């Protein structure tokens, strides 16, 4: 079969890591030909994939034009389908404003559209709610086949989008974590005698990183002897930190996938204050790197981490601070989280299993499409 891997809409966030990981596995499916449409953010993969005889890459950033949103047509992508006699399209993550007229599997990772009971909804205004309704419509009209990374989300999506088929393919850490020779040691953190909490993430509103300001305030007042810093992978200008608390924070900007393992090596705790997720690769990444996890006491987090994390009440800065302090000072407890994490990893699809499942789903829906024709 001829299959388009559509990553033309990916600019930042966890989708970049998933697309990178999936594309690196395509060489194993020699019975299929892949046309991989890379956004400029993923353009570096052209060199990585050039040795694979069954993979062709093109770099293209799909424009978010009114015409494309309304009609679902994109001349460049439609021409790719026609010229390469494509059987099916796998959009790594939507929403896909392009609506191909062939079998189409679309990844769904917009928890905001389904987890309506999240504390996040107390933080957003009318503008955000309208945006979510547009996303909801774009997803619903873009495909008849979806996959999510969490069975709980799959169930919610199936109920919400009646008449569609929803598959579950869990996320994992990128294969570069198992290839130490490819780790980039470019992000060396300043020396620090204390506990380093790492959060690898784009500064999305639902990640709730502002809680760290209140965590720092609490720790500076209640536990002044406890030395801790928070390493964040976005720019300082994205989050206003009071001058008297700046020593708690280390902003290092965006990082490449290959730079992440070394950051984990330099850290003591993975802290993730997110209020909603379908999945976040930072959980399995921390498990793989042997780091204890501190995260929110919410259903999706429990479903992904089980006994491998220390949980705190989602919007309670004091609880977050106490959880960090407990993990940092109770070495036996921290080690138990790490050991539980190694066991929890076995429950996820590995990067190879994820690729196998996605290609198998494409084979199924493309075959079904041929039969219907």
Briefly describe each language-model feature range.
Residues 4, 189-207, 213-216:
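Conserved donor-binding/catalytic core segment of Leloir-type glycosyltransferases
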Residues 77, 81, 262-267:
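Short alpha-helical donor nucleotide-sugar binding micro-motif in glycosyltransferases
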Residues 125-146:
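Membrane-proximal helix-turn-helix segments that form the acceptor-binding/catalytic region
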Residues 238-261:
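Nucleotide-activated donor-binding/catalytic signature segment of Leloir-type glycosyltransferases, i.e.
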Residues 275:
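Aromatic "clamp/platform" in nucleotide-sugar-dependent glycosyltransferases that forms part
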Residues 292-295:
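Short hydrophobic beta-strand element within catalytic cores of glycosyltransferases
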Residues 310-317, 326-331:
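Conserved acidic donor-binding segment of nucleotide-sugar-dependent glycosyltransferases
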Residues 332-363:
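A charged, aromatic-enriched C-terminal amphipathic alpha-helix characteristic of glycosyltransferases
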């Amino acid at each position: 079969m001829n299959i388009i891997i559509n990553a033309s809409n990916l600019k930042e966030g966890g989708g970049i890591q998933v697309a990178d990981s999936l594309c690196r596995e395509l060489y194993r499916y020699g019975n299929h030909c892949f046309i991989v449409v890379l956004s400029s953010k993923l353009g570096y993969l052209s060199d990585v994939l050039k040795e694979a005889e069954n993979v062709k890459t093109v770099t293209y950033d799909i424009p978010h034009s009114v015409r494309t949103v309304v009609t679902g047509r994109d001349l460049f992508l439609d021409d790719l389908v026609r010229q390469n006699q494509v059987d099916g399209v796998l959009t790594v993550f939507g929403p896909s404003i392009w609506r191909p007229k062939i079998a189409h599997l679309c990844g769904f990772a917009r928890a905001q559209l389904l987890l309506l009971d999240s504390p996040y909804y107390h933080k957003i205004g009318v503008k955000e709610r309208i945006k979510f309704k547009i996303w909801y419509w774009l997803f619903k009209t873009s495909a008849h086949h979806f996959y999510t990374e969490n069975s709980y989300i799959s169930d919610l999506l199936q109920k919400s989008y009646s008449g569609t088929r929803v598959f579950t393919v869990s996320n994992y850490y990128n294969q570069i974590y198992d290839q130490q020779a490819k780790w980039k040691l470019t992000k060396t953190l300043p020396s620090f005698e204390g506990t380093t909490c790492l959060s690898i993430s784009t500064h999305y509103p639902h990640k709730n990183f502002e809680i760290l300001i209140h965590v720092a305030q609490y720790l500076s007042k209640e536990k002044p002897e406890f030395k801790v810093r928070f390493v964040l992978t976005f720019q300082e200008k994205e989050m206003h930190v009071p001058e008297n608390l700046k020593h708690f924070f280390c902003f290092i900007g965006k990082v490449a996938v290959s730079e992440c393992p070394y950051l984990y090596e330099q850290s003591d705790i993975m802290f993730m204050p997110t209020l909603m997720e379908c999945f976040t690769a930072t959980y399995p990444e921390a498990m793989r790197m042997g780091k204890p996890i501190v995260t929110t006491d919410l259903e999706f987090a429990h479903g992904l981490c089980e006994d491998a994390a220390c949980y705190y009440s989602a919007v309670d800065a004091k609880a977050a601070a106490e959880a960090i302090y407990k993990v940092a000072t109770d070495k036996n407890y921290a080690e138990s989280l790490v050991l539980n994490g190694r066991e929890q990893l076995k429950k996820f699809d590995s990067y190879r299993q994820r690729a196998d499942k996605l290609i198998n789903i494409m084979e199924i829906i493309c075959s079904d499409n041929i039969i219907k024709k």
